[in-house]
Amino acid sequence: MPEPHAVLYVTNELSHIVKSGFLPIWRLTGVESLNVLWLENGKYATDVYAYGDVSKWTIRQLRGHGFIFISTHKNIQLADIIKTVDVRIPREVAKSQDMKAFENEIGRRRIRMRKGFGDALRNKLFKMAIEFHGSEAETLNDANPRLHKIYGMPEMPPLYIEYAEIGTRFDDEPTDEKLVSMLDYIVYSAEEVHYVGCGDLRTIMQFKKRSPGRFRRVLWHVYHPIAPESSDPNVIVHNVMVDSKKDILKHMNFLKRVERLFIWDVSSDRSQMDDDEWESTRFAEDRLGEEIAYEMGGAFSSALIKHRIPNSRDEYHCISTYLLPQPGADADMYELRNFMRLKGYSHVDRHMHPDASVMKVVSRDVRKMVELYHGRDRGRFVKNRLFEHLHIVRKNGLLHESDEPRADLFYLTNRCNMGLEPSIYEVMKKSVIATAWVGRAPLYDYDDFALPRSTVMLNGSYHDIRILDGNGAILFLMWKYPDIVKKDLTYDHAWAMNFAVSLKEPIPDPPVPDISLCRFIGLRVESSVLRVRNPTLHETADELKRMGLDLSGHLYVTLMSGAYVTDLFWWFKMILDWSAQSKEQKLRDLKRSAAEVIEWKEQMAERPWHVRNSLIAALREYKRKMGIREGASIDSWLELLRHL
């Protein structure tokens, strides 16, 4: 059966380019009715180019159809908003009429658009959840460390610890300048940072530009003889040389219970020193930083110390938890960072990291780490791994028990959880929002397995849990929480539809057939495909209709095709309560709810869309055909339908 497709809508100046491509082309006249648009879109099994007039449709209707907006212009006028385009095509690409360049531009942008889906879910969760499971750097970037507990199983970064392997080289990409990268991975939960050797403040000003939220929530004490005054009220400049802990302690208020971070980046001028003198000076400076940090260990949660690798020592000792490579450093910079876990107050439980202690360092091993991971063409993924390793509490969400509101995004169907499907469904039942992969297309970038869509629908829907595909979830949040998920959101709906999303939400009252619930693009085609490939699947339905009885083909094909994820509890309530009303009452409820639809049959406006017995018949037939293979209980739904 076909997987979700995108409608790649191009504005008129690009329509000539798409005609030279190989994807289907859909010309829109602007006079199509709701049903015609629904039927026409349902005939496509691959991504399709479209052009023409869409000004009478709203953004949610077009997103429900899977529209991605592509133009050389900045905006497109729709019925309810002026939409910022999703893919802005450079004019030189449009002029060149190079189809490969055009499609590469779309593809690259769509990869980046995937992030919009996860970000929208997190925006809702940051207001509702306390615990975040399966977390990566994206969650840390926007989490509040004073409120949120961030759990996950992130990949280990390269690091040096006594008696352990360093790791192997992996593909990487360029990142920020090394000192900005340092702040980017070390600053998360600290409320007060004491930064010795800050220089001219350029580094923290660049960090402010890169991450204004994290910069603002820190009180910065910066120490350097040449540091200029700062106009930022949270930056306090101390024009001193730091020689002992006294120079730091006198600037600390111990009546405040805050998390503190100590950064030491001291390097004196070489002046007239020879090689031996210079190496001894550098070695002493780095050890002094460690000693000062260790002596103040009760006041600081952690420290990050400059660590230059000696040229003339095969082995040496330092006080450390881990030695870390420097993302963004030059390939020949034989300098690391020394992370020390200390004993001061912390918002993050870092007990899984060893306390800082005396550690023997083998010079050739740490030089090897420089050679593996340093370089201007590298550092982005190393930095992310360091960020995650230092600030995410290592815990498997599938095994975690807690009464706190929780979020479970993008990890439940990692291949390591295969065989734990009952636990996955239990987590989805408890979570504020959870995601599971249901896509059947090959996965090139992720190591996930797919849950069957029909099983997810039958297992996931409860009176207080909605189960929708990812596009439906975003459309639901746009509808119910427009202040959190904006209509102008850019995301790739076709990518989102590869996920089932559970949301701890009640059934809307009245239970209207909003776009978030009812899209079923291509349902008629799915039915025909079942018939032409295996007509026995339709025999019972055909026979019942000949007898004057009915079976809900809509429900039956939805389950048999495995092509859709929608909320059964809400859908049944919609059919039995809302669709049983008159046309006038139906329209009144839609208007009162501010709901929108993409399918409306005028001939069914005054009639119920299905009746209870036809739904029961469809479930019974699905059980007869698939009951042995179906992992979910169908009998519980039959019982519910009898009493709903």
Curated annotation (Swiss-Prot):
Gene3D superfamilies: Orbivirus VP4 core protein, C-terminal domain (1.20.1280.200), Vaccinia Virus protein VP39 (3.40.50.150)
GO cellular component, one term: viral outer capsid
InterPro entries (UniProt xref): Orbi_VP4, Orbi_VP4_C, SAM-dependent_MTases_sf
Localization per Swiss-Prot or TrEMBL: Virion
Cited CDD domains: capping_2-OMTase_Orbivirus
Assigned keywords, A-Z: Capsid protein, Outer capsid protein, Virion
Primary site of residence: virion
Taxonomic superkingdom: Viruses
SS bond list: none
Known function: The VP4 protein is one of the five proteins (with VP1, VP3, VP6 and VP7) which form the inner capsid of the virus.
Family under the similarity heading: Belongs to the orbivirus VP4 family.
Name recorded for this polypeptide: Core protein VP4
Originating organism: Bluetongue virus 2 (isolate USA)
